[in-house]
């Protein structure tokens, strides 16, 4: 039928958050009433006065919502700013993964490139540019801004995106799960490849970045209705 939605065949969508360390400021039980906390977090991230590498990581974390270790180990060789794509091997599934980059993400990468673009890592360590930044760098910045481990973690950006994209912006669960680099399978148990729904995911990632901008800027954000596509 023309109104068939393949998302209905997904096994276990949406997947449960990975591990215990996924505290995030947004409580889905409170719904849209809790989005003000997200706006406050985003404003704090953009006003952080630390070094430029950590600044860029903090701004990118909610936009791209990759795993914290994948963000830390981001390599310039894997990022194509002209195509607005970041391709790498997902740390958990060990499968090739594509992150479509919103215009906001591309801008952040371009601003950082003159500082770190000659090296291997997008976010090099403070002590050695041949190593990625410390796994505690983003956590320490969050603590400095007043967010403890029970309130917000580096992994919490994934939990935030997963919940808001689904429950507030109403994007299809399979689009979200693919973008989270979870091992998504259809009703036959066949895993989708990395390019599955890529055009739709590109639109979703741009809509997500635009939505976060609207929250941060205090605009009257109207949820999108896309799930029943």
Residue ranges with predicted function:
Residues 43-55, 64, 99, 107-130, ...:
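Short, basic (Lys/Arg/His-rich) helix/loop patches that form interaction surfaces
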């Amino acid at each position: 039928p023309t109104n068939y939605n393949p998302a209905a065949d997904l096994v276990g969508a949406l997947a449960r958050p990975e591990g215990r360390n996924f505290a995030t400021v947004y409580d889905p039980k409170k719904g849209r009433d809790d989005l003000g906390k997200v706006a406050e977090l985003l404003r704090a991230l953009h006003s952080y006065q630390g070094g430029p590498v950590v600044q860029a990581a903090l701004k990118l974390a909610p936009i791209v919502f990759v795993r914290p270790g994948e963000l830390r180990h981001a390599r310039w060789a894997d990022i194509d700013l002209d195509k607005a794509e970041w391709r790498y091997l997902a740390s958990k599934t060990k499968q090739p993964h594509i992150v479509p980059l919103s215009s906001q993400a591309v801008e952040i990468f371009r601003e950082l490139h003159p500082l770190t673009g000659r090296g291997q890592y997008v976010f090099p360590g403070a002590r050695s540019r041949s190593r990625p930044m410390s796994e505690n760098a983003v956590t320490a910045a969050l603590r400095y801004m007043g967010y403890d481990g029970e309130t917000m973690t580096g992994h919490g950006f994934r939990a935030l995106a997963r919940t808001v994209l689904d429950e507030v912006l109403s994007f299809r669960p399979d689009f979200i799960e693919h973008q989270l680099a979870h091992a998504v399978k259809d009703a036959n148990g066949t895993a989708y490849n990395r390019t599955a729904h890529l055009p739709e995911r590109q639109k979703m990632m741009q809509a997500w970045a635009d939505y976060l901008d609207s929250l941060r800027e205090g605009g009257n954000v109207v949820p999108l209705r896309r799930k029943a596509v």
